[in-house]
A protein has these predicted regions:
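Glycine-centered flexibility sites
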Residues: 16, 41, 53, 84, ...
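Short, electropositive, low-hydrophobicity segments enriched in small/polar residues
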Residues: 20, 39, 57, 88-89, ...
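C-terminal substrate-binding subdomain of Rossmann-fold SDR/epimerase-dehydratase oxidoreductases
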Residues: 102-167
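Conserved alpha-helical elements of sugar-nucleotide-dependent glycosyltransferases
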Residues: 16, 96, 153
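Glycine-rich "substrate-gating" loop/helix at the edge of Rossmann-like oxidoreductase active sites
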Residues: 49-52, 80-94, 114-125
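Short beta-loop-alpha junction of Rossmann-like oxidoreductase domains
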Residues: 43, 85-88, 155-157
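N-terminal Rossmann-like NAD(P)+-binding domain of SDR-like oxidoreductases, especially those catalyzing
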Residues: 1-82, 104, 126
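Hydrophobic alpha-helix immediately C-terminal to the catalytic Tyr-X-X-X-Lys motif of short-chain
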Residues: 58-66, 96, 100, 157, ...
């Protein structure tokens, strides 16, 4: 989506994030930064695959420099396919599980791109909120990667709904 909405992506992830960083720095507020696991793949080389991954990874570099220059306090949390109540179920930003949930509720077959073997790691929203709170309480300036250890193929996830699947 960041290719299609480059301006929005850049304004939000670069300019918007820098404003938040500055506000936290000016007001001595510790930041909990939501990073993206999209920039971690392929030994970090995936950070250049999209404007989204690139801008998010540049923000990490900027945070590291703010720490060196101003002793800026933050915790960085990498999220993996968060799901749970009120997840996005429709539109360009819908999650895989959200799309499946929406189709399931409408009694439609779940859409899976063949062969369905693409794998993902998922994290429930409650676990995400819990680790954000725990990270905020610590004063470590660390990076946390939040995901279930088990990976699932998209087809495995679709089959968990016990309904029709459309390729």
């Amino acid at each position: 989506q960041s290719f299609k909405n480059f301006d929005k992506c850049f304004k939000s992830n670069s300019l918007g994030s820098q404003e938040v960083f500055k506000f936290c720095l000016d007001n001595n507020i510790k930041l909990i930064y939501s990073a993206t696991s999209a920039s971690l793949g392929n030994n970090g080389k995936d950070k250049d695959l999209s404007p989204y991954a690139f801008t998010k990874s540049k923000n990490i570099e900027f945070l590291e420099n703010l720490k060196k220059w101003f002793n800026f306090k933050y915790e960085v949390i990498y999220f993996y396919n968060v799901y749970g109540p009120n997840q996005i179920c429709k539109g360009d930003m819908a999650t895989v599980i959200g799309i499946f949930e929406d189709h399931y509720r409408q009694k439609k077959a779940l859409p899976v791109v063949k062969p369905g073997k693409q794998t993902r790691r998922f994290t429930h929203i409650n676990d995400t909120v819990d680790i954000c709170y725990k990270a905020w309480k610590k004063k470590l300036c660390r990076h946390y990667s939040i995901a279930n250890k088990k990976t699932y193929s998209i087809l495995e996830v679709a089959r968990m709904f016990n309904t029709k699947i459309k390729y």
